[in-house]
């Protein structure tokens, strides 16, 4: 720590001596006017180069335009990706809903349509697809009246509902 503080003190004195020497040389010329003031009054050239500043401003403006173009391309790409992500998530949610609905009903998870096997095996639809006219079968009394249970008359309800 002591070595470091000695180093910085020496550096400070060197810098301080350079500044004091520069002041002494300016005072030693006898005019007492600094060189900056001479440039202002003596010549018509400005201290700041305006042409360099303007060219730097133009370069910065061109860089900003390029950055904005890149940003617009990225913005378009992110908008497209967001749209695609929305479509994919909608399809996935629909698929999950279909699977949950079908498993609740006891069907195959990806089945779409009616779950009644009688609807799927409709003989009328087969005859219509063959081009044959649909002949209405005559309804008999046996088809309309329910069958009476045979045997015990007290047991009117039958089936797995007991």
Swiss-Prot record:
UniProt entry keywords in alphabetical sequence: Malaria, Signal
Stretch list, region Disordered: 24-44, 109-162
Biased composition (Polar residues): 137-162
Signal peptide: 1-16
Biased composition (Low complexity): 114-130
Coiled coil: none
A Pfam family reported for this protein in Swiss-Prot or TrEMBL: CRA
Other information: Although there are no authentic repeats in this antigen, there are a number of internal homologies (N-A-N-P) and (N-A-D-P), the first of these tetramers is the dominant repeat found in the CSP of P.falciparum and reacts with antibodies against CRA. It is possible that immune responses to CRA may act against the CSP also. The CRA is found in many parasitic strains.
Name of the protein: Circumsporozoite protein-related antigen
Biological source species: Plasmodium falciparum
């Amino acid at each position: 720590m002591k070595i470091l503080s000695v180093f910085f003190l020496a550096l400070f004195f060197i810098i301080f001596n350079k500044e004091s020497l520069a002041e002494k040389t300016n005072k030693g010329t006898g005019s007492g006017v600094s060189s900056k003031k001479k440039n202002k009054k003596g010549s018509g050239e400005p201290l700041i180069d305006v042409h360099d500043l303007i060219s730097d401003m133009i370069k910065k403006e061109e860089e900003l335009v390029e950055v904005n173009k890149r940003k617009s391309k990225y913005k378009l790409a992110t908008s497209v990706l967001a749209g695609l992500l929305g479509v994919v998530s909608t399809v996935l949610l629909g698929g999950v809903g279909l699977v949950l609905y079908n498993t609740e009903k006891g069907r195959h998870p990806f089945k779409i349509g009616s779950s009644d096997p009688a609807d799927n095996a409709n003989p009328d639809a087969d005859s219509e697809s063959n081009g044959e006219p649909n002949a209405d079968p005559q309804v008999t009394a046996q088809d309309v009246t329910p069958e009476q249970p045979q045997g015990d008359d007290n047991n009117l309800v039958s089936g797995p509902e007991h």
